[in-house]
Amino acid sequence: YDRVLTMGQDTLLVLGRPDEPLLQMLLEAASDLRVVVGDRMEEMAPAAPDATLILSWSATRELLRDVLAVTPHLRWLHIMSAGINHLLSPELAATPALLTNGRGAFSSSLGEWVMGAILYFAKDFRRLIRVQGEGRWEPCDVTEVKGQTVGIVGYGDIGREVGTRAHAFGMHVLGLTRRGPATPPPGDPAEAIFGPAERLDMIARCDYVVVTAPLTPETRGLMGAAEFAAMRPDAVLINIGRGPVVDEQALIAALSQG
C-alpha cells in the first residue's frame, strides 16, 4: 500500500506495518486524518514535521526515538503494547505530548493464553503431540485442574482475567499485590489476596504460579531463589510478564537442582 494513505488536517504517523484487515479498520476510524504508515525513518521523514499524532504499532526504540526528534507539533503518542520498557529513550521521556498505552486491551486474550498453558501441562499436550507425530497411541495419565490452586503474582487487570477463567475451571485462585494483604471484593475470583511479606506462603500453596507483574525497579528479579525454593517440586511457573521479573539464573539453578 502507499505510504500516505488518507488526507486530512491532522497527520497520524503509524510506526509499523499493521496486517491488512487491521489497517483497513484503522483507516476507517481515522478517515478525517492524514495517515502515513511505515517502519523506516525515510518513510516517516517527509510527514514528521507536521505530525500531531503517533501510533506506535510495532516500532523499534530507534525508530521511535528518531521520529520523536523531528515531530515538534506532536500532541499525542499512543503505544499499542501494555509495556513500554522496550521503547524507553531520553526522547520519549522528554516528550511533552500525551502518552498512552494499551493497558487492559490484551487482558482477556492473555487470560485465555494462561489457561491454555495450564491445560498444556495438566493434560501433557507436549507428549500427546509427540506420539501423534510418531503415528502411535499410548495410554497416559493426566491431571484435572479442578481443585488445584493457581497463584497470581501481580494481581491486576490481567491477573483478574486469569483468575476469572481459572475459577471457572474450578481452581482455587490466590492473588499477590504490592498493596496486600487485602480482602477480595465481592465477586472477585480470588479466595485471598496476599502482600509481599506473605508471598512465599502463597507460592508454597500453588500448583501453578502465574507471573503477570509489570517490570519496575521493585519487581526486577521478583521471582528469585527464595521463591523457587518455596515452590512445590511439581509446581509450574508461567510468566506472561516481562522476562527480567524472573531471575533467570536462579530459575536455571532451581531447575538443575530438581
Where are each of the predicted segments found?
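Conserved beta-strand positions in the Rossmann-like core of class I SAM-dependent methyltransferases
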Residues: V36, L174, P244
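Phosphate-coordination loops involved in phosphoryl transfer and adenosine-cofactor binding
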Residues: Q9, K146-T149, A225, D234
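Rossmann-like adenosine-cofactor binding region
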Residues: G180-G258
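Conserved N-terminal Rossmann-fold NAD(P)-binding element of oxidoreductases
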Residues: L15, G151-G154
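An N-terminal-biased, well-structured beta-alpha scaffold segment characteristic
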Residues: Y1-L98, G224
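Phosphate-binding beta-alpha-beta segment of Rossmann-like dinucleotide-binding domains, i.e.
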Residues: A94-T149, D157, E161-T164, A168, ...
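A short, aliphatic-rich alpha-helical micro-motif
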Residues: A45-P49, L68-T71, V145, D201-C206, ...
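Short beta->alpha connector loops at strand-helix junctions that form conserved
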Residues: W57, M80, L98-G104, A197, ...
